[in-house]
């Protein structure tokens, strides 16, 4: 079933991406002549790593999301900066893992295509291949990005697990993404984990009166309180209990039952458009979810890209040239 879904997605993307020129200079197969081995090399690195640690899928997906939402998809989240002043040192990025996969991919590519492939393109490919490794969606990745030189901890302003629907829609629109993209990309939480500190107020003091969030199913809230005590700072919770290692539709089913882990998950029911998209995924048994996810990932991957002579091609992904 997963293989057939990926085939359908790939066919739809060939029609979509080749029929519409990308004015930003990105295209599928940008390196077809200069580094034809690119995708095979990256895929092998990702699959080898995820065979050993399948839970890396969610952090790698988040890494691409976090990169694109700050300064655009320019690989700035990968940079190490003096005194921990780069993006990766910001609180929302402290839980990112898998930087070694980017490093290993870059090192392997430098052996066969030195100075050709950008780190920002590697990250885009890694995010896709991580989903495929989990039998999730596949899509044609547009390449041609160049790497940014700036990474500033003070510029990290990402959508938050505490955000309401108005803030979420505003943040996504600022990146050229609409309500459907918000819902579909939130579906990536099907493989996610959350930590107790992000739930403390929602479970124990939502309005400052020792109460829980009324938008959270009471039975589910009781289960969460057993796992997350008020002072718990370390326990990790599955965002899609029982299915967090599989990229599937169950996230939307949970949200519709008021069992989304974060306030931002519950918020998807607070707007007529986003609620309709959630219910549509359930009603159609997610028949278009894999395809829609790929479409939204391609759209996000066009955010603020550097192309042409802008930026650079880094020699290593952790430092500018």
From Swiss-Prot:
One of its GO terms (cellular component) is extracellular region. Its cofactor is heme b; Ca(2+). It catalyses: 2 a phenolic donor + H2O2 = 2 a phenolic radical donor + 2 H2O. PROSITE patterns: PEROXIDASE_1, PEROXIDASE_2, PEROXIDASE_4. The record marks 62 as: Transition state stabilizer. Ca(2+) 1 binds at residues 67, 70, 72, 74, 76. The active site is at residue 66. It is found in: Secreted. GO terms for molecular function: heme binding; lactoperoxidase activity; metal ion binding. Its EC number is 1.11.1.7. Glycans are attached at residues 164, 205. Keywords: Calcium, Disulfide bond, Glycoprotein, Heme, Hydrogen peroxide, Iron, Metal-binding, Oxidoreductase, Peroxidase, Secreted, Signal. Disulfide bonds join 35-113, 68-73, 119-317, 196-228. Its main location: secreted. GO terms for biological process: hydrogen peroxide catabolic process; response to oxidative stress. It comes from the Eukaryota. Substrate binds at residue 159. InterPro entries: Haem_peroxidase, Haem_peroxidase_sf, Peroxidase_pln, Peroxidases_AS, Peroxidases_heam-ligand_BS, Secretory_peroxidase. Induction: Up-regulated transiently by a cold treatment. Removal of H(2)O(2), oxidation of toxic reductants, biosynthesis and degradation of lignin, suberization, auxin catabolism, response to environmental stresses such as wounding, pathogen attack and oxidative stress. These functions might be dependent on each isozyme/isoform in each plant tissue. There are 73 peroxidase genes in A.thaliana. Belongs to the peroxidase family. Classical plant (class III) peroxidase subfamily. This is Peroxidase 27. The lineage of its organism: Eukaryota, Viridiplantae, Streptophyta, Embryophyta, Tracheophyta. The gene is PER27.
């Amino acid at each position: 079933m997963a293989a057939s879904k990926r085939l359908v997605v790939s066919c739809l993307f060939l029609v979509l991406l080749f029929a519409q020129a990308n004015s930003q200079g990105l295209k599928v197969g940008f390196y077809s002549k200069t580094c034809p081995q690119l995708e095979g090399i990256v895929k092998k690195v990702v699959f080898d790593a995820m065979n050993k640690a399948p839970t890396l899928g969610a952090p790698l997906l988040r890494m691409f999301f976090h990169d694109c939402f700050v300064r655009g998809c320019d690989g700035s989240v990968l940079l190490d900066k003096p005194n921990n002043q780069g993006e990766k040192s910001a609180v929302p990025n402290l839980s990112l893992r898998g930087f070694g996969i980017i490093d290993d991919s870059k090192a392997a590519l430098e052996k066969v295509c030195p100075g050709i492939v950008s780190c920002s393109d590697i990250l885009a490919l890694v995010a896709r291949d991580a989903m495929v490794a989990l039998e999730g969606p596949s899509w044609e990745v547009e390449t041609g990005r160049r790497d940014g030189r700036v990474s500033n901890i003070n510029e990290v302003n990402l959508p938050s697990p505490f955000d309401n629907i108005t803030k979420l829609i505003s943040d996504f629109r600022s990146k050229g993404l609409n309500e459907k993209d918000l819902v579909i990309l939130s579906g990536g939480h099907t493989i996610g984990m959350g930590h107790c500190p992000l739930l403390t107020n929602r479970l124990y003091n939502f309005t400052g009166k020792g109460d829980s969030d009324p938008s959270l199913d009471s039975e589910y809230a009781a289960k969460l309180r057993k796992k997350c005590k008020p002072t718990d700072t370390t326990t990790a919770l599955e965002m899609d209990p029982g299915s967090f290692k599989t990229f599937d539709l169950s996230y939307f089913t949970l949200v519709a039952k008021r069992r989304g882990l974060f306030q931002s998950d519950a918020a998807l029911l607070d707007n007529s458009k986003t609620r309709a998209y959630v219910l549509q995924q359930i009603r159609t048994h997610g028949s278009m979810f894999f395809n829609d996810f790929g479409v939204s990932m391609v759209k996000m991957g066009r955010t603020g890209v550097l192309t042409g002579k802008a930026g650079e091609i880094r020699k290593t992904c952790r430092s500018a040239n």
